[in-house]
């Protein structure tokens, strides 16, 4: 549900799309790969993100898990067992990449934010391998090859406790943005 703080709030996603359009962005693609074993489009629907994005005027919504036009990218100096990752060509060819995570607690990482949200650009096999290795190091390795132009962090209702799926939403009431995701 949209108020569970499991996903970025639909309102923040819609606001980012509207602001990008106002700033003169051309084609805006909302792209996501949901958690392992989950149907990305069903998750976007049940979270309210799909409708909010469409209402805000997004040009396309893509499920990265079903993308077949992938480019194998080597990680130059990996700190984890991840030495390469397959990324969607459209993502690598985009003029800009805007990362829009929600801030929440995470049992495997203490908290989840900009770096952890980058897992939304890889397919299930990479999700799985990252969880089988040092997850924090794998996220840093992915961050070396996927560099968002802008990160907008939803801290309106972040999650505390047993996240990323079973925590408790808390009212915080702000959005934080910057060019350096770390």
Place the predicted regions along the sequence by residue.
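N-terminal and secondary-structure boundary signal
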Residues: 1-182
């Amino acid at each position: 549900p949209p108020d569970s703080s499991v996903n970025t709030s639909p309102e923040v996603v819609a606001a980012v799309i509207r602001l990008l359009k106002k700033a003169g962005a051309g084609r805006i693609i909302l792209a996501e790969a949901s958690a392992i074993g989950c149907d990305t489009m069903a998750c976007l629907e049940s979270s309210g993100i799909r409708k909010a994005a469409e209402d805000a005027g997004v040009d396309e919504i893509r499920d990265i898990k079903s993308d077949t036009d992938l480019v194998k990218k080597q990680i130059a100096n990996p700190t984890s067992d991840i030495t390469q990752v397959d990324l969607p060509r459209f993502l690598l060819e985009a003029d800009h990449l805007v990362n829009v995570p929600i801030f929440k607690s995470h049992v495997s990482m203490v908290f989840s934010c900009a770096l952890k949200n980058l897992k939304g650009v890889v397919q299930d096999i990479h999700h799985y391998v990252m969880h089988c290795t040092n997850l924090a190091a794998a996220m840093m390795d992915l961050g070396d090859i996927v560099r968002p132009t802008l990160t907008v962090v939803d801290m309106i209702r972040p999650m505390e406790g047993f996240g990323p799926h079973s925590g408790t939403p808390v009212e915080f009431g702000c959005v934080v943005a910057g060019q350096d995701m770390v």
